[in-house]
């Protein structure tokens, strides 16, 4: 365990601590080597406060290991925003250049997007913290997987096409019907009578502008070509979105957030006489890492058919702006807007 501490101390002193490896491999042994071992030398789960300490300490290395207890007693006066260490930034800058060179060689369509709210992708990934975040393993930088971007863009099309059918009043059931039809690869049967509604939503109008004067069946054909089905791969590649290197040199790329569930005993208990949700339950703070507002990302899509790829990119812009990507989007997280 002492070797682990020495390793992280060395990384901090050299300003090259890999945030991804630290976050996933060493918590919370950096704070208290004894945290993961109980008196019987068995693995023990860290408490909420210990998780909080481990998250906060990302920006401070190990805060002079022998002074941690004193720091804790002073209510953790630790910066809750995390910048990329200088040496790690230099390595990431080189990776970013290689990545953009690759995109250019493929003639991908790229755009700069900035987070309009906090962003967290991979919140439910397996982690000793109970919460997680998706980081580039070798660089400790948050990113948005291309699969996540493709998924939210595809769902945007389901929501819009759900406006085109009039089977029932439940909008989300209609959207699910559209989704099932697309996944099976035969949406035309379900959408054979689909038509643009007279009262089209703002999102619907922007969606239709992307496809011009095309009729609904032609739009469906192009969507199948973009996203594919269970039997056929799509013709457009959705690349991972990564932070723009030159714009994050002195900008925090991670910050601490908190969720505060109150009624765990009511929902988790199998007993019948448990008191209903109310003020008599205690909040249980759960700390987790997010990407702050105003962090720039490079978003890219590619494909052989340039016109089809441009339409896919336009759909991505709508999806990131209106639906958001990652976890907690219903609370406003994960919104990104293109900028110049």
Swiss-Prot record:
Compartment(s) where it occurs, according to its Swiss-Prot or TrEMBL record: Cytoplasm
InterPro entries named in the record: CRISPR-assoc_prot_TM1791, RAMP_III_fam
Pfam families linked: RAMPs
Main location: cytoplasm
Superkingdom classification of source: Archaea
BP GO annotations: defense response to virus
Signal peptide location: none
Molecular function terms, GO-annotated: RNA binding
UniProt cross-references to PANTHER family, sorted A to Z: CRISPR SYSTEM CMR SUBUNIT CMR6 (PTHR39965:SF1)
Family classification: Belongs to the CRISPR system Cmr6 family.
Biological role: CRISPR (clustered regularly interspaced short palindromic repeat), is an adaptive immune system that provides protection against mobile genetic elements (viruses, transposable elements and conjugative plasmids). CRISPR clusters contain sequences complementary to antecedent mobile elements and target invading nucleic acids. CRISPR clusters are transcribed and processed into CRISPR RNA (crRNA), formerly called psiRNA (prokaryotic silencing) in this organism.
Subunit structure: Part of the type III-B Cmr ribonucleoprotein (RNP) complex, an elongated RNP with Cmr2 and Cmr3 as the base, with Cmr4 and Cmr5 forming a helical core along the mature crRNA (39 or 45 nt in length), while the complex is capped by Cmr6 and Cmr1. The 5' end of the crRNA is bound to Cmr2 and Cmr3, while Cmr6 and a Cmr1 subunit (Cmr1-1 or Cmr1-2) cap the 3' end of the crRNA.
Protein name: CRISPR system Cmr subunit Cmr6
Organism per entry: Pyrococcus furiosus (strain ATCC 43587 / DSM 3638 / JCM 8422 / Vc1)
């Amino acid at each position: 365990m002492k070797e682990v501490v020495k390793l992280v101390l060395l990384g901090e002193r050299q300003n090259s601590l890999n945030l991804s490896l630290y976050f996933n491999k060493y918590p919370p042994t950096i704070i208290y080597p004894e945290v993961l071992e109980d008196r019987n030398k068995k693995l023990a789960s860290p408490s909420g406060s210990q998780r909080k300490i481990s998250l906060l300490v990302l920006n401070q290395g190990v805060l002079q290991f022998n002074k941690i207890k004193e720091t804790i007693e002073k209510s953790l006066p630790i910066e809750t925003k995390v910048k990329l260490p200088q040496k790690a930034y230099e390595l990431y800058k080189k990776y970013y250049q290689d990545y953009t060179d690759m995109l250019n060689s493929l003639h991908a369509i790229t755009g700069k997007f900035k987070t309009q709210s906090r962003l967290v992708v991979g919140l439910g990934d397996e982690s000793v913290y109970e919460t997680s975040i998706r980081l580039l393993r070798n660089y400790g930088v948050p990113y948005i997987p291309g699969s996540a971007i493709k998924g939210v863009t595809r769902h945007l099309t389901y929501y819009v096409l759900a406006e085109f059918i009039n089977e029932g009043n439940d909008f989300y059931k209609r959207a699910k019907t559209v989704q099932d039809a697309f996944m099976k690869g035969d949406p035309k049967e379900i959408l054979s009578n689909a038509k643009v509604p007279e009262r089209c939503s703002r999102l619907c109008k922007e969606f239709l502008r992307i496809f011009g004067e095309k009729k609904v069946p032609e739009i469906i054909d192009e969507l199948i070509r973009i996203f594919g089905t269970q039997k056929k791969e799509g013709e457009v590649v959705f690349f991972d979105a990564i932070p723009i290197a030159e714009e994050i040199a002195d900008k925090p790329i991670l910050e601490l957030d908190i969720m505060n569930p109150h009624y765990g005993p009511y929902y988790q208990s199998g007993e019948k006489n448990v008191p209903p949700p109310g003020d008599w339950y205690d909040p249980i703070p759960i700390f987790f890492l997010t990407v702050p507002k105003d962090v720039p990302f490079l978003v890219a899509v590619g494909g052989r058919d340039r016109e089809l790829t441009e339409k896919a990119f336009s759909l991505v812009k709508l999806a990131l702006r209106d639906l958001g990507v990652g976890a907690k989007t219903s609370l406003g997280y994960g919104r990104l807007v293109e900028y110049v």
